[in-house]
């Protein structure tokens, strides 16, 4: 995992990103739903590792061993964001936004992830763009984690 930190540059970021699309039921108010989801996702209690942990380096910096330690002051408003697409809110604008969000490096003084809820899409759709550093979780683990969060079985869901 340390190699992903050593090899990272502005030109070669070492994070993975993904977009998920969700269609809201007709009887759900989009603005109300978004506000509820933001409030829910921004609650720091119950957030599990590695999302609650911050990178700690030894005196050798990124070339030495790395470890993750609990971030006791995690700023969930920093990690969980909202963005509204300009009208008419096409998928092209969503992908342009995701590209801009993906282009910046993650702040190594904070837990190495961000999620953005994206509104303004057609057909009552909402998107999430998630960015996670590869040192924290690889692509396969990210897919497994996302699938477990979205499971219809509450016993399998975790956040």
Regions found by a protein language model. Name each.
Residues 1-159:
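Non-catalytic N-terminal regions of enzymes
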């Amino acid at each position: 995992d340390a190699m992903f930190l050593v090899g990272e540059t502005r030109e070669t970021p070492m994070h993975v990103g993904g977009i998920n699309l969700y269609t809201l039921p007709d009887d759900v108010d989009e603005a109300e739903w978004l506000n509820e989801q933001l409030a829910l996702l921004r609650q720091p209690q119950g957030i599990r590792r590695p999302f609650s942990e911050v990178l700690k380096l030894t005196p050798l910096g990124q070339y030495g061993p790395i470890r993750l330690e609990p971030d006791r002051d995690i700023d969930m408003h920093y990690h969980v964001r909202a963005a509204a697409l300009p009208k008419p809110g096409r998928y092209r604008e969503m992908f342009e936004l995701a590209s801009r969000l993906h282009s910046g490096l993650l702040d190594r003084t904070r837990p190495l992830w961000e999620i953005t809820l994206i509104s303004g899409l057609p057909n009552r759709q909402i998107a999430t763009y998630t960015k996670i550093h590869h040192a924290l979780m690889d692509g396969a683990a990210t897919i497994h984690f996302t699938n477990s969060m979205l499971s219809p079985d509450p016993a399998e869901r975790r956040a």
